[in-house]
């Protein structure tokens, strides 16, 4: 959530930044006018209340003097009626301002490339060289079916489109991957957490999914509960409405969880395979940091995600997202895109973002600065470390052999009971 004071005092700069995220200047101008109206009404209310207090004192004095108070009582009633009417108007204005501040996206950092969409993203670096095959590489969905480890047909029968069963070494591979990821993040100082997979609406508001993106979630009908779209939600809200000790920052959390997404607006995109599912496992990283340290922490978090891909020897590239492609809560985002041979393309496998104080303001996560004793909003960061299903897809395609088998990456073999190959 944006700071209304920042919008008020630095309006032109904020408007210019938000315009790069598709926010119409007319929206901000309307917000500015409503905010000015609110402040004028507040002045009127305080003036009227002061007058009412004066009249009340005069009534008390008149009663002590046994004087007639009818006129003064009538005047006080009129003042009270005016205050009541203005309070009602203020409530409407506050609701409108809340709607503005909770639905406007975060302000992009100066280092974020300006652009309309993903075509304007900027590649930062690459790692590894895509493998050259001496045979036609298969898509991971075909490999998975041929190996008997992925079953979309029965997933569709039991649930519906974009669901599947992992079987045998497929299930073992999925488990090996997320255990490996959690172990690697643990070495980097992350505390492993098992979170609830259901959260309340306040938690969804805290991280920015609500109210704007309700259509992307699975709500439990007639309840205050939602299936988590990412472990970012429970991990970040762990400290909601709390004040942390500044000397304890930064704090690192990691968790593996299922993620549930309706994929509204994704009709026709990635209809086959593991790239876009309604339910998938993901290992998440979340950080709580002091403002002056958050961008250094973003670079470290991105490196933590890269470490997984490097140890799995999967070629990838790092991309800085443009202002038009970043997520709602982010002020800066790096995407990691892994090479998918059958698509001859890099596909997103991780997204690492600094939200600065955007989520912390919504969730009221603060810290007491040990330097001056003041309570301040901290910065929150989140990143995938990694999306597990997409990692399975990348391994199946990059490690496939001409006979249809798939070699298991060396880093995962200790987690696979020593198995080296998945054979048809």
UniProtKB/Swiss-Prot annotation:
Q: Which CDD domains match?
A: SerRS_core
Q: Which pathway does the database say it acts in?
A: Aminoacyl-tRNA biosynthesis; selenocysteinyl-tRNA(Sec) biosynthesis; L-seryl-tRNA(Sec) from L-serine and tRNA(Sec): step 1/1
Q: Which GO terms describe its cellular component?
A: cytoplasm
Reaction it catalyzes: tRNA(Ser) + L-serine + ATP = L-seryl-tRNA(Ser) + AMP + diphosphate + H(+); tRNA(Sec) + L-serine + ATP = L-seryl-tRNA(Sec) + AMP + diphosphate + H(+)
Which EC number(s) does UniProt give?
A: 6.1.1.11
Q: MF terms per GO, please? A: ATP binding; catalytic activity, acting on a protein; serine-tRNA ligase activity; transferase activity
The record's subcellular location field reads: Cytoplasm
User: Single Gene Ontology BP term?
Assistant: seryl-tRNA aminoacylation
Keywords from UniProt, A to Z, are:
Aminoacyl-tRNA synthetase, ATP-binding, Cytoplasm, Ligase, Nucleotide-binding, Protein biosynthesis
EC class = ligase
- Report residues binding ATP: 261-263, 348-351
Give the matching Gene3D superfamilies.
Answer: Bira Bifunctional Protein, Domain 2, Serine-tRNA synthetase, tRNA binding domain
Q: Which SUPFAM superfamilies match?
A: Class II aaRS and biotin synthetases, tRNA-binding arm
Q: Which domain of life is it from?
A: Bacteria
InterPro entries, per the entry: aa-tRNA-synt_IIb (IPR002314), aa-tRNA-synth_II (IPR006195), aa-tRNA-synth_II/BPL/LPL (IPR045864), Ser-tRNA-ligase_type_1 (IPR002317), Ser-tRNA-synth_1_N (IPR015866), SerRS_1_N_sf (IPR042103), SerRS_core (IPR033729), tRNA-bd_arm (IPR010978)
Enumerate the residues binding L-serine.
230-232, 284, 384
Function of the molecule: Catalyzes the attachment of serine to tRNA(Ser). Is also able to aminoacylate tRNA(Sec) with serine, to form the misacylated tRNA L-seryl-tRNA(Sec), which will be further converted into selenocysteinyl-tRNA(Sec).
Subunit-structure text: Homodimer. The tRNA molecule binds across the dimer.
By sequence similarity, the record places it as follows: Belongs to the class-II aminoacyl-tRNA synthetase family. Type-1 seryl-tRNA synthetase subfamily.
Which PANTHER family did the record assign? SERINE--TRNA LIGASE (PTHR43697:SF1), SERYL-TRNA SYNTHETASE (PTHR43697)
Domain comment (free text): Consists of two distinct domains, a catalytic core and a N-terminal extension that is involved in tRNA binding.
**HAMAP family per record:** Ser_tRNA_synth_type1
Q: What's the name of the protein?
A: Serine--tRNA ligase
The organism of origin for this protein: Streptococcus pneumoniae serotype 2 (strain D39 / NCTC 7466)
Q: What is the lineage of its organism?
A: Bacteria, Bacillati, Bacillota, Bacilli, Lactobacillales
Q: By which gene is this protein encoded?
A: serS
């Amino acid at each position: 959530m944006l700071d209304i004071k920042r919008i008020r005092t630095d309006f032109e700069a904020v408007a210019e930044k938000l315009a790069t995220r598709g926010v119409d200047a007319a929206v901000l101008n309307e917000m500015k006018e409503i905010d000015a109206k609110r402040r004028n009404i507040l002045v009127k209310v305080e003036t009227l209340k002061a007058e009412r207090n004066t009249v009340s004192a005069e009534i008390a004095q008149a009663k002590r003097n046994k004087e007639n108070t009818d006129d003064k009582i009538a005047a006080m009633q009129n003042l009270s009626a005016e205050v009541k009417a203005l309070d009602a108007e203020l409530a409407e204005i506050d609701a409108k301002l809340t709607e503005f501040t909770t639905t406007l996206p975060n302000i992009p950092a100066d280092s974020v490339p300006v652009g309309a969409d993903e075509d304007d993203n900027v590649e930062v670096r690459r790692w590894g060289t895509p493998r050259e095959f001496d045979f036609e590489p298969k898509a991971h969905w075909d490999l998975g079916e041929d190996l008997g480890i992925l079953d979309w047909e029965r997933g569709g029968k039991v649930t519906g489109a974009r669901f599947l069963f992992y079987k045998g070494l497929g299930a073992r591979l999925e488990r090996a991957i997320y255990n490996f990821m959690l172990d690697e993040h643990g070495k980097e100082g992350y505390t492993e957490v098992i979170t609830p997979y259901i959260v309340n609406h306040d938690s969804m508001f805290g991280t920015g999914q609500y109210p704007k993106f309700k259509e992307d979630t699975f709500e439990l009908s007639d309840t205050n509960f939602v299936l988590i779209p990412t472990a970012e939600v429970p991990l970040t809200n762990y400290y909601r409405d709390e004040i942390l000790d500044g000397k304890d920052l930064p704090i690192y959390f990691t968790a593996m969880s299922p993620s549930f997404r309706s994929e509204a607006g994704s009709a026709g995109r990635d209809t086959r395979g593991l790239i876009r599912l309604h339910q998938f496992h993901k290992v998440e990283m979340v950080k709580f940091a002091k403002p002056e340290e958050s961008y250094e922490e973003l670079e470290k978090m991105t490196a933590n995600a890269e470490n997984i891909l490097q140890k799995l020897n999967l070629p990838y590239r790092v991309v800085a997202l443009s202002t038009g492609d970043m997520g709602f809560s982010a002020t800066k985002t790096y995407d990691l895109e892994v090479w998918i041979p059958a698509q001859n393309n890099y596909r997103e496998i991780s997204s690492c973002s600094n939200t600065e104080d955007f989520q912390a303001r919504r969730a009221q996560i603060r810290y007491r600065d040990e330097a001056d004793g003041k309570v301040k909003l901290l910065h929150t960061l989140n990143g995938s470390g990694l999306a597990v299903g997409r990692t399975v897809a990348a391994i199946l395609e990059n490690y496939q052999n001409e006979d249809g088998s798939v070699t298991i990456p060396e880093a995962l073999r200790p987690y696979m009971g020593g198995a080296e190959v998945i054979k048809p």
